[in-house]
């Protein structure tokens, strides 16, 4: 892996991340393909209509179904899906946290029940990496101890201490694999925890950086119930503690506004189900704000979703047609709406990158907000 930082404009960064399955210009938004598939889309959409250099798969879900060992027999995620570009896999800790009421955390790992059949499973830091090796992920996330917010201070303290110990176990396990000539193209990211507490974020960041050579650092435990202002403040004081020569990934975030504010605070990578989930539910993102395509007001609207969008959907179809497809329950709506929302997100970060490279980031950010709420949406 190679990470080259080209330009910093304020704290916003433009860089290139080189991985085994292609280069990734940052800032970057990564579409979420939980089940090794971005919902409603195929590879032609991802490669041609959206041009995504990296997508996410989820360790928890793929371990349970179809099984990581089965995927390994079929050539890992790339052989299994035939998607030729990069995969990042989450550790599954968030799903164990969010999908199961009977999850138990211990020093060994996370015990959880399958949401599919109720069977019990144990995720340890080492087990998670073994799964991710089977998936042959380009970027692997370590297992972390996630806490929902608000949470007692003692629970957050326990979380960062356990996350650090698990990260150390992950790093030692990964280094042992590399010493045997294995896992040479699987790159490991640590995850900073600490809630919205400045002291805890500093402790977590410095502890993880001090462990050794992680390939990148994620900021986890945000967008889990705290106000946006607290999330932005947390990013403001967390990113300076992370190495400048390593990529920074804000997990599970978020709205276009969240992404703009995180880029402004030095974050490079993002993922979220929002663009595809909102698309399926009738909410489309535009340069002028959100648009509810289910509204009767669009029944005779011949305009594209967004006059400034270059996506396949906006080039070929009107708001009226999308309104009809949604209200009729047509499956084609899900594809066309998802193409648009993901293209909007990818164009948002591409525009940010161009602005940073030309040192006009402040103006790009200003223009982003100036257009929000205009009548067009």
Curated annotation (Swiss-Prot):
Q: Give the UniProt entry's GO cellular component terms.
A: cytosol
> Which cofactors go with this protein?
Zn(2+)
| Catalytic activities | 7-aminomethyl-7-carbaguanine + guanosine(34) in tRNA = 7-aminomethyl-7-carbaguanosine(34) in tRNA + guanine
Similarity annotation:
Belongs to the queuine tRNA-ribosyltransferase family.
Q: What does this protein do?
A: Catalyzes the base-exchange of a guanine (G) residue with the queuine precursor 7-aminomethyl-7-deazaguanine (PreQ1) at position 34 (anticodon wobble position) in tRNAs with GU(N) anticodons (tRNA-Asp, -Asn, -His and -Tyr). Catalysis occurs through a double-displacement mechanism. The nucleophile active site attacks the C1' of nucleotide 34 to detach the guanine base from the RNA, forming a covalent enzyme-RNA intermediate. The proton acceptor active site deprotonates the incoming PreQ1, allowing a nucleophilic attack on the C1' of the ribose to form the product.
Taxonomically, which superkingdom? Answer: Bacteria
EC no. given is 2.4.2.29
The record's section on SUPFAM superfamilies has: tRNA-guanine transglycosylase
Task: Locate the region RNA binding.
Answer: 252-258, 276-280
One GO biological process from the UniProt record? queuosine biosynthetic process
Write down the top EC class of this protein: transferase
Q: How cofactor binds (record note)?
A: Binds 1 zinc ion per subunit.
Q: Where does Zn(2+) bind?
A: 309, 311, 314, 340
Please name the catalytic residues of this protein.
90 (proton acceptor), 271 (nucleophile)
State how it assembles. Answer: Homodimer. Within each dimer, one monomer is responsible for RNA recognition and catalysis, while the other monomer binds to the replacement base PreQ1.
Pathway annotation: tRNA modification; tRNA-queuosine biosynthesis
Please give the InterPro entries that the UniProt record associates with this protein.
Answer: TGT, TGT-like_sf, tRNA_ribo_trans-like
Keyword GTP-binding assigned: no
Q: Which UniProt keywords apply?
A: Glycosyltransferase, Metal-binding, Queuosine biosynthesis, Transferase, tRNA processing, Zinc
**Binding-site list for substrate:** 90-94, 144, 193, 221
Annotated protein name in UniProt: Queuine tRNA-ribosyltransferase
